[in-house]
């Protein structure tokens, strides 16, 4: 376990670049003083933001890059134009070279996945990486994956996701045998496509001692906390994520409007202010920011591109926790134990951007 956690940041990533990344890193540093940052991007822009954060400046090293991956770049274009010389690539490469323990970027999802996969490669037995994140539920938190790394997936791919997600839940939630469910349109065994039904059969046949497969989980089961780990292919997983985030913002706006409609509601809000603040915090998507790319020979964390500084800080916190929990080692150990259960299959599936 390293004394210092070394975090490489793609300072040019996201909708706002250094104006969000640098203040966000400063917020996270305040919570984790044992962090050293490598900041990749336009040195002039980075230094301008660092001037307002002397503690972060002291804990950082700036590495200038001339190329930044645009949010609208296709993965193939980003690889061709930004391989080796972009802020995103160099931040990932720092993990490969063991100069950093984790990479965090708010940049283009498809480009980040393509570069991470190309630079770091996948773990043995893993055909494609997945994006996993913790999801607030009525029972605490669950790990949900894949949230949009790739589209589609056969039964073996879903099985690999279940194994990796269970390893992540075991580490984060200190569970000896987390429950695992497959996201489906119904809980009955006859529901869903051939791939998901076959995946369920494979997971039941494993009879794993490291997780408890409970079968299918419907969409509303995610928020209910029906399982410690919810597994889906990336298309449905990303839709579920965006729908939940949109619903949270919609409800927050409804509450704000209702509480400011009349003088009576305003007085009522004053009496219930603490409860409403707790609800707002629970529903804030920024506080669940930070998806982990599972299945790579290194740790990469993806932040929402449009997040604010506080939201980006939470993504940096996720990266910090993954290093301190030694997640990569734990996943490797789990995959090695279950090596016979995994069969990597080549795939040309499109990366979600």
UniProtKB/Swiss-Prot annotation:
InterPro entries: FA_synthesis, Phospholipid_synth_PlsX-like. Gene3D superfamilies: Isopropylmalate Dehydrogenase. It is found in: Cytoplasm. GO terms for biological process: fatty acid biosynthetic process; phospholipid biosynthetic process. It catalyses: a fatty acyl-[ACP] + phosphate = an acyl phosphate + holo-[ACP]. Belongs to the PlsX family. This is Phosphate acyltransferase.
């Amino acid at each position: 376990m390293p004394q210092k956690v070394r975090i490489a940041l793609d300072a040019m990533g996201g909708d706002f670049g250094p104006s969000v990344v640098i203040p966000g890193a400063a917020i996270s540093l305040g919570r984790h003083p044992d962090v050293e940052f490598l900041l990749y991007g336009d040195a002039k822009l980075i230094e301008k933001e660092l001037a307002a954060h002397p503690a972060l400046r002291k804990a950082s090293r700036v590495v200038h890059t001339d190329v930044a991956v645009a949010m609208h770049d296709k993965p193939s274009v980003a690889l061709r134009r930004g391989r080796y010389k972009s802020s995103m690539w160099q931040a990932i490469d720092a993990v490969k070279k063991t100069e950093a323990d984790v990479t965090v970027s708010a940049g283009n999802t498809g480009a980040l996945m393509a570069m991470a996969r190309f630079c770091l490669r996948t773990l043995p037995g893993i055909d494609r990486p997945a994006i996993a994140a913790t999801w607030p539920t009525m029972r605490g938190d669950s790990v949900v994956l894949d949230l949009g790394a790739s589209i589609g997936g056969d039964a073996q791919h879903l099985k690999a996701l279940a194994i990796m997600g269970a390893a992540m839940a075991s580490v984060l939630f200190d569970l000896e045998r987390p429950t695992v469910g497959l996201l489906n349109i119904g809980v009955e065994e006859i529901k869903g496509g051939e791939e998901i039904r076959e995946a369920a059969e494979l997971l039941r046949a494993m009879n794993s001692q490291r997780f408890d497969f409970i079968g299918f989980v419907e969409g509303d089961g995610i928020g209910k906390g029906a399982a410690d780990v919810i597994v889906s292919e990336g298309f449905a997983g990303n839709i579920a994520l965006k729908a939940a985030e949109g619903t949270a913002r919609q409800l927050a706006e409804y509450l704000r409007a209702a509480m400011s409609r009349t003088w009576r509601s305003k007085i009522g809000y004053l009496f219930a202010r603490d409860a409403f603040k707790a609800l707002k915090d629970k529903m804030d998507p920024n506080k669940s920011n930070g998806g982990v790319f599972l299945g790579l020979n290194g740790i990469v964390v993806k932040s929402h591109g449009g997040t604010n500084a506080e939201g980006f800080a939470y993504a940096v916190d996720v990266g910090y926790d993954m290093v301190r929990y030694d997640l990569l080692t734990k996943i490797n150990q789990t995959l090695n134990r279950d090596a016979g259960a995994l069969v990597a299959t080549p795939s040309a599936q499109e990366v979600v951007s």
